[in-house]
Amino acid sequence: MAKDAGLIEANGELKVFIDQNLSPGKGVVSLVAVHPSTVNPLGKQLLPKTFGQSNVNIAQQVVIGTPQRPAASNTLVVGSPHTPSTHFASQNQPSDSSPWSAGKRNRKGEKNGKGLRHFSMKVCEKVQRKGTTSYNEVADELVAEFSAADNHILPNESAYDQKNIRRRVYDALNVLMAMNIISKEKKEIKWIGLPTNSAQECQNLEVERQRRLERIKQKQSQLQELILQQIAFKNLVQRNRHAEQQASRPPPPNSVIHLPFIIVNTSKKTVIDCSISNDKFEYLFNFDNTFEIHDDIEVLKRMGMACGLESGSCSAEDLKMARSLVPKALEPYVTEMAQGTVGGVFITTAGSTSNGTRFSASDLTNGADGMLATSSNGSQYSGSRVETPVSYVGEDDEEDDDFNENDEDD
């Protein structure tokens, strides 16, 4: 039949149609030749199929196979007149294009989800939550998390993933450090913060500027108070030496008040109940009226030992003497203090009272019947002045030791 239709040559081979695009509207016959071993013995055969009309003007191809070409069993020849090639599909093995196959493509897709961006986010969250951490700590936690999530991975693949995770964590830390989100000092990693916009950054800088200016003011107040203390102490020492030279003898023991001390001032009509401990280091006062507490520095200022620097009423002669009582590096500060009133002295002693503080009896009713004071030579004293300069601590200690020795002798 094929020979009568002109499809077979005289030598028995199939004739190839060369000019098939004469009329795109005509139906085209496609022939598929299959190896005899693949033909069903029950009599089912592959018959030529006639395709419908095609509206696309594309050259139609005829898929031809020869009976002499070997073909494996369970293999289908897939061809189409619209495709220029033919390929064989096996029925025993699933196609690699299946999204459910556990091949390289699927595993590669899983690893693509653990890229640098993914690990940067994870590392950023870890460091932000901890505040201060290290590379090993972050890497170990992430390895533990991903290893627990991927239990089906083989041991050799798990080791590879752990190395990959640690490398990604290292890269992510470098990226975050380059963006100034974290800082690294030796092995310690600290969280700085996420980048902000210009307006917010400007606002944060302004807040930081105000905070630092406030700290500078506090430090200036501390420095001024320390300068006043040094001037008052040195001026007192010079006055005592001058008095001893004039009297040609030391002052009587009962007329000496050792530093530090406090003075309690109240009305003559106030009833005072005073209790003293056995070691004479603690005194308990009960007042039925208002009273004032003054520390030693306040008393020295009222005596004029600060040369008027605390009130800005320093004369040229007092300024010259005050400048001679301080180190040369502090002389400009003394000049500035003399030009204006020193105000807002910053007090750092915990539980202290300001100079010349006034109390009332009602202020002492919250869980206490009175006030507790310490002896002038006691170490438990807490006054409002800043710490005594170092150059005078030794003298005070020596005087206190002598005083204690005299008490023991008595």
Curated annotation (Swiss-Prot):
Chain span(s) of sequence motif DEF box: 161-195
Region called Disordered, residue ranges: 73-116, 370-410
CDD domains found in the cross-reference section: DP_DD
Alphabetical keyword list: Acetylation, Activator, Cell cycle, Cytoplasm, DNA-binding, Nucleus, Phosphoprotein, Transcription, Transcription regulation, Ubl conjugation
Region called DCB1, residue ranges: 214-246
Location of the region described as Enhances binding of RB protein to E2F in the Swiss-Prot/TrEMBL record: 211-327
Modified residues (Phosphoserine): 23
GO MF assignments: cis-regulatory region sequence-specific DNA binding; DNA-binding transcription factor activity; DNA-binding transcription factor activity, RNA polymerase II-specific; DNA-binding transcription factor binding; protein domain specific binding
Entries under SMART domains matching the protein: DP (SM01138), E2F_TDP (SM01372)
Residue ranges with Polar residues bias: 73-100, 373-385
Region listing for Interaction with CEBPA, in residue ranges: 105-127
Region (Dimerization): 204-277
Region named DCB2: 259-315
Main location: nucleus
Induction: Down-regulated during differentiation.
Biased composition annotated in UniProt, kind: Basic residues: 104-116
Residues modified to N6-acetyllysine: 3
Top-level taxon: Eukaryota
Similarity comment: family membership: Belongs to the E2F/DP family.
Miscellaneous section: E2F/DP transactivation can be mediated by several cofactors including TBP, TFIIH, MDM2 and CBP.
Classification via PANTHER family: TRANSCRIPTION FACTOR DP, TRANSCRIPTION FACTOR DP-1
Cited function: Can stimulate E2F-dependent transcription. Binds DNA cooperatively with E2F family members through the E2 recognition site, 5'-TTTC[CG]CGC-3', found in the promoter region of a number of genes whose products are involved in cell cycle regulation or in DNA replication. The E2F1:DP complex appears to mediate both cell proliferation and apoptosis. Blocks adipocyte differentiation by repressing CEBPA binding to its target gene promoters.
Protein name according to UniProt: Transcription factor Dp-1
Species assigned in the record: Homo sapiens
Phylogenetic lineage: Eukaryota, Metazoa, Chordata, Craniata, Vertebrata
Recorded name of the encoding gene: TFDP1
